């Protein structure tokens, strides 16, 4: 049982790491975060229905981009293994098929969980910003992607860290910091949390 768990965690961790290094993940996550965060500004003049429109649009975008990202990551994870020939070598060793495919699924699910954390945080903040004005939260929310990219670029230049995975993780961390700041100051639309968790 212990060996099975070690193999499972090793394959799932490598799958998550490979998925985090895909440029499409960073591109889709950043564009989703920016689009959701700009929705309160773009949909400002809707005669009192701005909050509902922002909430529905943000949840729909969260679902659609998560679906596209999950499909791409799952097909890319298995496609790479088949093209490289590592699938046959892994399955010829004492790794069962069910363990391999469940670990691949868990790795893709881990990457999607990070994506959902980022877009869920932005959805909660955008739902509140559509109703109430919070300039400090808005500024922090709009600068989080740029700060993540800038710091990831510096880490890539000086420490040779991979840009895509570092920028993605920093984006999630910076959005979490903005969320904590907004929660402390009372600028979070908590009623969107169950819907965001269902997605």
Show where each model-derived region lies.
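Residue-level signal for short hydrophobic patches within transmembrane helices
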Residues: 12-16, 27-30, 58, 71
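Secretory targeting signals
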Residues: 36-77, 101-199
